[in-house]
Amino acid sequence: MTEFDLHAYMTRVGQQARAASRAMARASTADKNRALLTIAAAIRRDADKLKAVNARDVERARTNGQDAAFIDRLTLSDKAIATMAAGLEQIAALADPIGEISNMKFRPTGIQVGQMRVPLGVIGIIYESRPNVTIDAAALCLKSGNSTILRGGSEAIESNTALAALVAEGLAAAGLPSEAVQVIETTDRAAVGRLITMTEYVDVIVPRGGKSLIARLMEEARVPMIKHLDGICHVYIDDDADLEKAVRVCDNAKTQRYAPCNTMETLLVSREIAAKALPPLCRIYQEKGVELRVCPATRATLEAAGFSGLVDATEEDWRLEYLAPVLAIRTVDGLDAAIAHINTYGSAHTDSIITENYTTGMRFLREVDSASVMINASTRFADGFEYGLGAEIGISNDKLHARGPVGLEGLTSLKYVVFGHGEIRT
Protein backbone atom coordinates (compact mmCIF):
# COMPACT_ATOMS: atom_id res chain seq x y z
CA MET A 1 0.00 0.00 0.00
CA THR A 2 1.50 3.34 -1.08
CA GLU A 3 1.60 6.33 1.22
CA PHE A 4 -1.21 7.94 -0.77
CA ASP A 5 -3.33 4.80 -0.67
CA LEU A 6 -2.74 4.39 3.08
CA HIS A 7 -3.77 7.99 3.77
CA ALA A 8 -6.92 7.56 1.67
CA TYR A 9 -7.73 4.23 3.32
CA MET A 10 -7.34 5.58 6.86
CA THR A 11 -9.37 8.67 5.98
CA ARG A 12 -12.18 6.44 4.71
CA VAL A 13 -12.04 4.35 7.89
CA GLY A 14 -12.18 7.52 9.99
CA GLN A 15 -15.12 8.94 8.06
CA GLN A 16 -17.06 5.69 8.36
CA ALA A 17 -16.32 5.48 12.08
CA ARG A 18 -17.53 9.05 12.62
CA ALA A 19 -20.77 8.38 10.75
CA ALA A 20 -21.28 5.12 12.67
CA SER A 21 -20.66 6.88 15.99
CA ARG A 22 -23.73 9.06 15.41
CA ALA A 23 -25.87 5.98 14.83
CA MET A 24 -24.39 4.25 17.87
CA ALA A 25 -25.07 7.27 20.09
CA ARG A 26 -28.81 6.87 19.44
CA ALA A 27 -28.88 3.05 19.40
CA SER A 28 -31.29 1.49 21.88
CA THR A 29 -30.10 -0.50 24.86
CA ALA A 30 -31.98 -3.53 23.53
CA ASP A 31 -30.17 -3.42 20.18
CA LYS A 32 -26.77 -3.02 21.81
CA ASN A 33 -27.43 -5.93 24.16
CA ARG A 34 -28.70 -8.09 21.30
CA ALA A 35 -25.41 -7.54 19.48
CA LEU A 36 -23.36 -8.39 22.57
CA LEU A 37 -25.24 -11.61 23.30
CA THR A 38 -25.02 -12.70 19.68
CA ILE A 39 -21.25 -12.20 19.73
CA ALA A 40 -20.97 -14.18 22.99
CA ALA A 41 -22.93 -17.09 21.53
CA ALA A 42 -20.82 -17.02 18.37
CA ILE A 43 -17.59 -17.15 20.38
CA ARG A 44 -18.78 -20.22 22.28
CA ARG A 45 -20.02 -21.81 19.07
CA ASP A 46 -16.71 -21.25 17.26
CA ALA A 47 -14.36 -21.88 20.20
CA ASP A 48 -12.55 -24.75 18.47
CA LYS A 49 -12.16 -22.74 15.26
CA LEU A 50 -10.78 -19.79 17.23
CA LYS A 51 -8.23 -22.01 18.97
CA ALA A 52 -7.13 -23.49 15.64
CA VAL A 53 -6.68 -20.05 14.09
CA ASN A 54 -4.90 -18.77 17.19
CA ALA A 55 -2.56 -21.77 17.17
CA ARG A 56 -1.18 -20.55 13.83
CA ASP A 57 -0.45 -17.12 15.31
CA VAL A 58 1.21 -18.75 18.33
CA GLU A 59 3.34 -21.04 16.16
CA ARG A 60 4.58 -18.09 14.09
CA ALA A 61 5.40 -16.17 17.26
CA ARG A 62 7.43 -19.11 18.61
CA THR A 63 9.24 -19.44 15.27
CA ASN A 64 10.08 -15.75 15.47
CA GLY A 65 11.63 -16.25 18.92
CA GLN A 66 9.04 -14.46 21.06
CA ASP A 67 9.43 -15.00 24.81
CA ALA A 68 7.11 -16.84 27.19
CA ALA A 69 5.34 -13.70 28.42
CA PHE A 70 4.53 -12.71 24.84
CA ILE A 71 3.21 -16.19 24.03
CA ASP A 72 1.06 -16.14 27.17
CA ARG A 73 -0.58 -12.87 26.09
CA LEU A 74 -1.12 -14.15 22.56
CA THR A 75 -2.69 -17.51 23.43
CA LEU A 76 -6.46 -18.01 23.35
CA SER A 77 -6.90 -20.81 25.87
CA ASP A 78 -10.24 -22.39 26.78
CA LYS A 79 -10.29 -20.15 29.85
CA ALA A 80 -9.54 -17.02 27.81
CA ILE A 81 -12.32 -17.81 25.34
CA ALA A 82 -14.81 -18.52 28.13
CA THR A 83 -13.81 -15.26 29.83
CA MET A 84 -14.40 -13.28 26.64
CA ALA A 85 -17.90 -14.74 26.24
CA ALA A 86 -18.73 -14.22 29.91
CA GLY A 87 -17.46 -10.65 29.71
CA LEU A 88 -19.80 -9.91 26.81
CA GLU A 89 -22.75 -11.29 28.77
CA GLN A 90 -21.78 -9.34 31.86
CA ILE A 91 -21.54 -6.12 29.83
CA ALA A 92 -24.97 -6.82 28.32
CA ALA A 93 -26.35 -7.20 31.85
CA LEU A 94 -24.93 -3.87 33.00
CA ALA A 95 -27.08 -0.76 33.13
CA ASP A 96 -26.71 1.39 30.04
CA PRO A 97 -25.11 4.66 31.16
CA ILE A 98 -25.98 6.58 28.00
CA GLY A 99 -28.63 9.25 28.50
CA GLU A 100 -28.48 9.05 32.29
CA ILE A 101 -29.08 12.48 33.85
CA SER A 102 -27.56 13.27 37.25
CA ASN A 103 -26.62 16.13 39.57
CA MET A 104 -29.84 18.05 38.90
CA LYS A 105 -29.93 21.47 40.55
CA PHE A 106 -32.74 24.01 40.75
CA ARG A 107 -31.35 27.50 40.24
CA PRO A 108 -32.87 30.70 41.68
CA THR A 109 -33.49 31.86 38.10
CA GLY A 110 -35.98 29.03 37.59
CA ILE A 111 -33.87 26.82 35.35
CA GLN A 112 -32.85 23.26 36.20
CA VAL A 113 -29.25 22.26 35.44
CA GLY A 114 -27.98 18.69 35.26
CA GLN A 115 -25.46 16.48 33.51
CA MET A 116 -26.18 13.83 30.88
CA ARG A 117 -23.83 10.93 30.19
CA VAL A 118 -22.95 10.65 26.49
CA PRO A 119 -20.51 8.60 24.37
CA LEU A 120 -17.05 9.93 23.62
CA GLY A 121 -17.56 9.27 19.90
CA VAL A 122 -14.83 7.42 17.99
CA ILE A 123 -12.25 5.45 19.96
CA GLY A 124 -9.06 4.12 18.41
CA ILE A 125 -7.61 1.02 20.07
CA ILE A 126 -3.98 0.11 19.39
CA TYR A 127 -2.81 -3.20 20.82
CA GLU A 128 -0.17 -5.82 20.28
CA SER A 129 -0.32 -9.48 21.21
CA ARG A 130 -3.63 -9.76 23.09
CA PRO A 131 -6.40 -10.95 20.74
CA ASN A 132 -8.93 -10.85 23.59
CA VAL A 133 -8.65 -7.05 23.40
CA THR A 134 -10.53 -7.23 20.09
CA ILE A 135 -13.59 -8.48 21.97
CA ASP A 136 -13.15 -6.46 25.16
CA ALA A 137 -12.74 -3.23 23.19
CA ALA A 138 -15.56 -3.90 20.76
CA ALA A 139 -17.95 -4.84 23.58
CA LEU A 140 -17.28 -1.85 25.79
CA CYS A 141 -17.33 0.62 22.91
CA LEU A 142 -20.55 -0.92 21.60
CA LYS A 143 -22.39 -0.82 24.94
CA SER A 144 -21.21 2.74 25.65
CA GLY A 145 -22.54 3.94 22.28
CA ASN A 146 -19.17 4.58 20.66
CA SER A 147 -17.69 3.39 17.41
CA THR A 148 -14.17 1.99 17.42
CA ILE A 149 -11.21 1.51 15.12
CA LEU A 150 -9.09 -1.49 16.12
CA ARG A 151 -5.45 -1.81 15.18
CA GLY A 152 -4.05 -5.08 16.52
CA GLY A 153 -0.51 -6.34 16.18
CA SER A 154 0.59 -8.27 13.11
CA GLU A 155 1.52 -11.23 15.35
CA ALA A 156 -2.19 -11.79 16.14
CA ILE A 157 -3.62 -10.92 12.73
CA GLU A 158 -5.42 -14.23 12.12
CA SER A 159 -6.93 -14.34 15.62
CA ASN A 160 -8.06 -10.71 15.43
CA THR A 161 -9.61 -11.19 11.99
CA ALA A 162 -11.56 -14.24 13.15
CA LEU A 163 -12.85 -12.43 16.23
CA ALA A 164 -13.76 -9.33 14.20
CA ALA A 165 -15.90 -11.51 11.93
CA LEU A 166 -17.91 -12.63 14.97
CA VAL A 167 -18.35 -9.01 16.05
CA ALA A 168 -19.67 -8.16 12.57
CA GLU A 169 -22.13 -11.04 12.91
CA GLY A 170 -23.44 -9.58 16.16
CA LEU A 171 -23.79 -6.05 14.76
CA ALA A 172 -25.71 -7.35 11.75
CA ALA A 173 -28.07 -9.36 13.95
CA ALA A 174 -28.95 -6.21 15.89
CA GLY A 175 -29.31 -3.95 12.85
CA LEU A 176 -26.36 -1.78 13.89
CA PRO A 177 -23.85 -0.30 11.41
CA SER A 178 -20.98 -2.62 10.51
CA GLU A 179 -18.64 0.39 10.56
CA ALA A 180 -19.22 0.71 14.32
CA VAL A 181 -16.33 -1.74 14.81
CA GLN A 182 -13.61 -1.64 12.16
CA VAL A 183 -10.34 -3.57 12.14
CA ILE A 184 -7.51 -1.91 10.22
CA GLU A 185 -6.69 -4.44 7.55
CA THR A 186 -3.11 -3.40 6.82
CA THR A 187 -0.16 -4.31 9.04
CA ASP A 188 1.74 -1.24 7.77
CA ARG A 189 2.97 0.62 10.85
CA ALA A 190 2.27 3.92 9.12
CA ALA A 191 -1.41 3.21 9.76
CA VAL A 192 -0.78 3.75 13.46
CA GLY A 193 0.88 7.09 12.74
CA ARG A 194 -2.17 8.21 10.78
CA LEU A 195 -4.67 6.90 13.35
CA ILE A 196 -3.12 8.80 16.26
CA THR A 197 -3.18 12.11 14.37
CA MET A 198 -6.72 11.97 12.89
CA THR A 199 -8.18 14.53 15.28
CA GLU A 200 -10.98 15.25 12.82
CA TYR A 201 -12.31 11.68 13.13
CA VAL A 202 -10.93 10.10 16.33
CA ASP A 203 -11.79 11.40 19.81
CA VAL A 204 -9.49 9.28 21.97
CA ILE A 205 -6.79 6.62 21.58
CA VAL A 206 -6.46 3.69 23.98
CA PRO A 207 -3.12 1.88 23.55
CA ARG A 208 -2.67 -1.64 24.91
CA GLY A 209 0.90 -2.81 24.55
CA GLY A 210 4.48 -2.70 25.66
CA LYS A 211 6.41 0.23 27.00
CA SER A 212 8.03 1.05 23.66
CA LEU A 213 4.63 1.33 21.96
CA ILE A 214 3.20 3.58 24.68
CA ALA A 215 6.32 5.76 24.71
CA ARG A 216 6.14 6.20 20.94
CA LEU A 217 2.48 7.16 21.04
CA MET A 218 3.07 9.64 23.86
CA GLU A 219 5.63 11.37 21.63
CA GLU A 220 3.65 11.34 18.37
CA ALA A 221 -0.08 11.33 19.16
CA ARG A 222 -2.22 14.40 18.59
CA VAL A 223 -5.39 12.59 19.66
CA PRO A 224 -5.84 12.40 23.49
CA MET A 225 -4.95 9.06 25.08
CA ILE A 226 -6.15 6.86 27.93
CA LYS A 227 -3.08 4.83 28.88
CA HIS A 228 -0.59 3.52 31.39
CA LEU A 229 3.13 3.13 30.75
CA ASP A 230 4.16 0.58 33.41
CA GLY A 231 2.65 -1.79 35.95
CA ILE A 232 5.14 -1.60 38.81
CA CYS A 233 2.85 -2.95 41.53
CA HIS A 234 3.75 -3.32 45.22
CA VAL A 235 2.54 -5.24 48.24
CA TYR A 236 3.62 -3.94 51.66
CA ILE A 237 3.55 -6.31 54.65
CA ASP A 238 2.90 -4.12 57.69
CA ASP A 239 3.90 -4.66 61.34
CA ASP A 240 0.30 -5.62 62.11
CA ALA A 241 -0.12 -8.07 59.24
CA ASP A 242 -1.75 -11.47 59.63
CA LEU A 243 1.10 -13.69 58.40
CA GLU A 244 -1.17 -16.33 56.92
CA LYS A 245 -2.93 -13.65 54.87
CA ALA A 246 0.39 -12.11 53.91
CA VAL A 247 1.77 -15.37 52.53
CA ARG A 248 -1.42 -16.23 50.66
CA VAL A 249 -1.88 -12.77 49.12
CA CYS A 250 1.77 -12.18 48.22
CA ASP A 251 2.11 -15.62 46.66
CA ASN A 252 -0.94 -14.98 44.48
CA ALA A 253 0.08 -11.42 43.62
CA LYS A 254 3.35 -12.65 42.12
CA THR A 255 2.91 -16.21 40.91
CA GLN A 256 -0.71 -16.56 39.76
CA ARG A 257 0.45 -15.16 36.41
CA TYR A 258 3.66 -13.34 35.57
CA ALA A 259 2.71 -11.46 32.38
CA PRO A 260 -0.19 -9.16 33.43
CA CYS A 261 0.43 -5.54 34.36
CA ASN A 262 -1.25 -6.02 37.78
CA THR A 263 1.27 -8.63 38.95
CA MET A 264 3.37 -7.60 41.97
CA GLU A 265 6.92 -6.64 40.98
CA THR A 266 8.23 -5.33 44.33
CA LEU A 267 7.53 -6.71 47.81
CA LEU A 268 8.04 -4.35 50.74
CA VAL A 269 8.27 -5.75 54.27
CA SER A 270 8.36 -3.85 57.56
CA ARG A 271 11.61 -4.43 59.43
CA GLU A 272 9.66 -5.35 62.58
CA ILE A 273 8.03 -8.39 60.94
CA ALA A 274 10.61 -9.31 58.29
CA ALA A 275 12.15 -12.25 60.19
CA LYS A 276 8.71 -13.87 60.53
CA ALA A 277 7.21 -12.95 57.16
CA LEU A 278 10.04 -13.39 54.69
CA PRO A 279 11.22 -17.02 55.18
CA PRO A 280 7.88 -18.83 54.62
CA LEU A 281 7.00 -16.59 51.69
CA CYS A 282 10.40 -16.72 49.99
CA ARG A 283 10.48 -20.49 50.39
CA ILE A 284 7.34 -20.63 48.24
CA TYR A 285 8.86 -18.27 45.70
CA GLN A 286 12.03 -20.31 45.34
CA GLU A 287 10.05 -23.54 45.05
CA LYS A 288 8.20 -21.93 42.14
CA GLY A 289 11.41 -20.76 40.48
CA VAL A 290 11.09 -17.05 41.22
CA GLU A 291 14.39 -15.16 41.21
CA LEU A 292 14.67 -12.96 44.32
CA ARG A 293 16.45 -9.61 44.00
CA VAL A 294 16.95 -8.34 47.51
CA CYS A 295 18.21 -5.36 49.48
CA PRO A 296 21.04 -5.90 52.03
CA ALA A 297 18.65 -6.11 55.00
CA THR A 298 16.48 -8.68 53.23
CA ARG A 299 19.57 -10.71 52.29
CA ALA A 300 20.70 -10.77 55.93
CA THR A 301 17.27 -11.94 57.11
CA LEU A 302 17.01 -14.69 54.52
CA GLU A 303 20.59 -15.94 54.82
CA ALA A 304 20.12 -16.19 58.60
CA ALA A 305 17.18 -18.48 57.80
CA GLY A 306 19.34 -20.65 55.53
CA PHE A 307 18.47 -19.22 52.12
CA SER A 308 20.90 -19.07 49.20
CA GLY A 309 20.70 -18.16 45.51
CA LEU A 310 19.73 -14.56 46.22
CA VAL A 311 20.57 -11.72 43.82
CA ASP A 312 21.52 -8.23 45.02
CA ALA A 313 18.94 -5.65 43.97
CA THR A 314 20.15 -2.51 42.25
CA GLU A 315 18.51 0.91 42.17
CA GLU A 316 17.15 0.02 38.73
CA ASP A 317 15.28 -3.00 40.13
CA TRP A 318 12.90 -0.78 42.09
CA ARG A 319 11.77 0.76 38.78
CA LEU A 320 11.42 -2.44 36.72
CA GLU A 321 8.28 -4.16 35.46
CA TYR A 322 9.66 -7.68 35.05
CA LEU A 323 6.60 -9.50 33.63
CA ALA A 324 8.58 -12.62 34.54
CA PRO A 325 9.36 -14.88 37.55
CA VAL A 326 11.56 -12.21 39.12
CA LEU A 327 10.71 -10.30 42.31
CA ALA A 328 12.41 -7.36 44.00
CA ILE A 329 12.21 -7.38 47.81
CA ARG A 330 13.00 -4.49 50.14
CA THR A 331 12.89 -4.29 53.93
CA VAL A 332 11.65 -0.85 55.01
CA ASP A 333 11.35 1.06 58.28
CA GLY A 334 7.57 0.98 58.57
CA LEU A 335 4.61 2.61 56.87
CA ASP A 336 6.17 5.99 56.10
CA ALA A 337 9.08 4.38 54.29
CA ALA A 338 6.77 2.02 52.38
CA ILE A 339 4.57 4.86 51.16
CA ALA A 340 7.62 6.92 50.22
CA HIS A 341 9.08 4.01 48.26
CA ILE A 342 5.84 3.37 46.37
CA ASN A 343 5.28 7.02 45.49
CA THR A 344 8.92 7.36 44.37
CA TYR A 345 9.43 4.17 42.36
CA GLY A 346 5.92 2.99 41.52
CA SER A 347 3.96 3.58 38.34
CA ALA A 348 0.70 4.68 40.02
CA HIS A 349 -0.98 1.46 38.89
CA THR A 350 -1.91 -0.84 41.83
CA ASP A 351 -0.52 -1.20 45.35
CA SER A 352 -1.68 -3.20 48.37
CA ILE A 353 -1.04 -3.32 52.12
CA ILE A 354 -1.36 -6.37 54.36
CA THR A 355 -2.42 -5.16 57.81
CA GLU A 356 -4.98 -5.75 60.55
CA ASN A 357 -4.68 -2.13 61.71
CA TYR A 358 -7.61 -0.06 60.41
CA THR A 359 -5.90 3.30 60.89
CA THR A 360 -2.76 2.12 59.10
CA GLY A 361 -4.77 0.68 56.24
CA MET A 362 -6.82 3.83 55.74
CA ARG A 363 -3.71 5.98 55.78
CA PHE A 364 -2.20 3.74 53.08
CA LEU A 365 -5.36 4.18 50.98
CA ARG A 366 -5.21 7.96 51.30
CA GLU A 367 -1.49 8.53 50.80
CA VAL A 368 -0.47 6.02 48.12
CA ASP A 369 -0.97 7.89 44.85
CA SER A 370 -2.08 5.04 42.59
CA ALA A 371 -5.11 4.23 40.45
CA SER A 372 -6.01 1.20 42.61
CA VAL A 373 -5.03 0.91 46.28
CA MET A 374 -5.96 -2.17 48.32
CA ILE A 375 -6.03 -3.58 51.84
CA ASN A 376 -5.46 -7.33 52.36
CA ALA A 377 -6.06 -8.22 48.70
CA SER A 378 -3.93 -9.34 45.78
CA THR A 379 -2.96 -6.75 43.18
CA ARG A 380 -4.20 -9.28 40.61
CA PHE A 381 -7.74 -8.05 41.36
CA ALA A 382 -7.00 -4.75 39.56
CA ASP A 383 -8.98 -5.76 36.52
CA GLY A 384 -12.21 -4.61 34.93
CA PHE A 385 -13.81 -8.05 35.04
CA GLU A 386 -12.95 -8.48 38.75
CA TYR A 387 -14.22 -4.96 39.52
CA GLY A 388 -17.58 -5.81 37.98
CA LEU A 389 -17.07 -3.61 34.92
CA GLY A 390 -17.72 -6.58 32.62
CA ALA A 391 -14.36 -6.12 30.97
CA GLU A 392 -11.86 -3.33 30.66
CA ILE A 393 -10.60 -1.49 27.65
CA GLY A 394 -7.39 -0.73 29.49
CA ILE A 395 -6.00 0.62 32.73
CA SER A 396 -5.15 4.27 33.14
CA ASN A 397 -2.69 5.62 35.67
CA ASP A 398 -3.29 9.18 34.52
CA LYS A 399 -5.36 11.48 36.71
CA LEU A 400 -7.58 13.14 34.12
CA HIS A 401 -10.83 11.67 32.76
CA ALA A 402 -10.37 7.96 33.56
CA ARG A 403 -8.24 6.32 36.26
CA GLY A 404 -7.76 2.62 36.99
CA PRO A 405 -9.56 -0.08 34.98
CA VAL A 406 -11.53 1.67 32.24
CA GLY A 407 -14.98 0.23 31.71
CA LEU A 408 -18.22 1.72 30.40
CA GLU A 409 -18.20 5.02 32.28
CA GLY A 410 -14.58 5.64 31.30
CA LEU A 411 -15.72 5.67 27.66
CA THR A 412 -18.33 8.36 28.25
CA SER A 413 -18.33 12.01 29.20
CA LEU A 414 -20.81 14.37 30.80
CA LYS A 415 -22.49 17.27 29.07
CA TYR A 416 -24.60 19.89 30.80
CA VAL A 417 -28.33 19.91 30.10
CA VAL A 418 -30.64 22.78 31.05
CA PHE A 419 -34.43 22.66 31.45
CA GLY A 420 -36.34 25.91 31.41
CA HIS A 421 -39.82 27.39 31.13
CA GLY A 422 -38.99 30.40 29.01
CA GLU A 423 -36.54 31.95 31.49
CA ILE A 424 -34.21 34.70 30.23
CA ARG A 425 -31.03 36.07 31.78
CA THR A 426 -31.28 39.55 33.24
Curated annotation (Swiss-Prot):
One term under GO cellular component: cytoplasm
Pathway: Amino-acid biosynthesis; L-proline biosynthesis; L-glutamate 5-semialdehyde from L-glutamate: step 2/2
Catalytic activity: L-glutamate 5-semialdehyde + phosphate + NADP(+) = L-glutamyl 5-phosphate + NADPH + H(+)
Subcellular location: Cytoplasm
PROSITE patterns attached to this UniProt entry: PROA
Organism: Cupriavidus metallidurans (strain ATCC 43123 / DSM 2839 / NBRC 102507 / CH34)
The protein's enzyme class: oxidoreductase
Family that this chain belongs to: Belongs to the gamma-glutamyl phosphate reductase family.
One GO process term, biological-process aspect: L-proline biosynthetic process
Pfam families, per the entry: Aldedh (PF00171)
Domain of life: Bacteria
UniProt KW Amino-acid biosynthesis keyword: yes
Cited function: Catalyzes the NADPH-dependent reduction of L-glutamate 5-phosphate into L-glutamate 5-semialdehyde and phosphate. The product spontaneously undergoes cyclization to form 1-pyrroline-5-carboxylate.
EC number(s) from the headed UniProt entry: 1.2.1.41
Molecular-function annotations in GO: glutamate-5-semialdehyde dehydrogenase activity; NADP binding
CDD domains assigned: ALDH_F18-19_ProA-GPR (cd07079)
Keywords: Amino-acid biosynthesis, Cytoplasm, NADP, Oxidoreductase, Proline biosynthesis
Name listed for the protein in its UniProt record: Gamma-glutamyl phosphate reductase
